[in-house]
Amino acid sequence: MGKTRNDDWRKVNYMEIIPYESRYAEDFRLLNEAWLEKYFVVEPYDSELLSQCEDIILKPGGFIFFIRIDSEIVGTAAYIFKSKGVYELGKMAVDPVFQGQKLGQKLMLFMLEFAQKNHWSKIILYSSRKLKNALYIYQKNGFIEVPLEPNLPYDRSDIKMELNLK
């Protein structure tokens, strides 16, 4: 099948960034469980999101994207709908075998462009100061630290960041 103009937005160098399809649900779960288990534990809310991503992320208005190299899914990120124009960036992971190739940065740039094209007002995220590389990418892309609210969705979170798009 030939390349169409609509495919251009997905191409980033040698990789493709593609939207969610149900056949990639297991990749979404496994990629995220790998980094969660490496640095933390898989919390109950994580398990819900990862095992029911269509119901909890997509149906309420969220989005999931994947990095595909050849036919292999090697990275993912999600936007979780919070309120009109406000989304939480989360569940961002790159397979350890493919880390160090700036795939996370390329995925982040795609995610930011997607938010801007959709005229969102704000992106929020929750992270941990333990994830220095992730925090560097967030700060490099304009995210700033904001106060944490009570009743956080994740026990591991000790930092909240946001990026105002308007």
Residue spans for each PLM region:
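Conserved glycine-rich acetyl-CoA-binding loop
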Residues: 72, 95-109, 118, 129-136, ...
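C-terminal "cap" of GNAT-fold acetyltransferases
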Residues: 14, 20, 121-141, 146-166
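Conserved N-terminal entry element of GNAT/NAT acetyltransferase domains
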Residues: 1-23, 165-166
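Intrinsically disordered, low-complexity regulatory regions of eukaryotic regulatory proteins
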Residues: 5-6, 86, 156
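Acetyl-CoA-dependent GNAT
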Residues: 19-91, 95-97, 105-110, 114, ...
